[in-house]
């Protein structure tokens, strides 16, 4: 469409910064955004001059997850059935990819639902003091679609993960 791309990539030496920029949707990921993220990380992985990527959300929000409005209204959102051996973008974009280089999530504002999955998919998370992590999709009855429920327990321990997944409560940065 005619709208600006919701993903910007800035290269600075060996560091590639992938920036989510959909202020009107609090950086929620719709179909085109998922594709753009997928392409950005595919290029980063193939770029020999790049050694680390930083995933960053513009406008004080990391990512509010999958764009439920877009998913609800869009006919152009095919269901991805990844063929075996093909790295197809998941609903959140790169979260099924396995990269050969580290990705750092620079989280400020909200990293909730699918946004939390993107943060968990990254190898390292750097949280600003105002960061809020949460599995908010529990409140809307949308399960974590892209491996988040598998990764979260490995990362923060099963008990805490179940607490976040079952209650959908928000966790402030100092607790995270």
Regions found by a protein language model. Name each.
Residues 60-64, 69, 112, 134:
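Short, active-site-adjacent cap segments at secondary-structure transitions
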């Amino acid at each position: 469409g005619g709208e600006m791309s919701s993903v910007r990539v800035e290269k600075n030496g060996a560091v590639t910064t992938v920036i989510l920029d959909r202020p009107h949707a609090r950086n929620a990921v719709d179909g085109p955004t998922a594709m753009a993220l997928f392409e950005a990380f595919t290029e980063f992985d193939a770029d020999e001059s790049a050694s680390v990527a930083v995933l960053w959300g513009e406008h004080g929000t990391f990512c509010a997850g999958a764009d439920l409005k877009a998913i609800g209204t869009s006919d152009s959102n095919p269901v991805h059935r990844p063929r075996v051996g093909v790295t197809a973008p998941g609903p959140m974009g790169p979260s099924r990819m396995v990269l050969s280089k580290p990705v750092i999530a620079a989280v400020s504002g909200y990293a909730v639902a699918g946004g939390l999955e993107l943060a968990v998919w990254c190898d390292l998370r750097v949280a600003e003091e105002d960061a809020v992590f949460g599995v908010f999709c529990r409140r809307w009855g949308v399960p974590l679609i892209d491996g988040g429920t598998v990764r979260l327990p490995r990362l923060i321990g099963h008990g805490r993960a179940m607490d976040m997944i079952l209650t959908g409560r928000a966790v402030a940065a100092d607790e995270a």
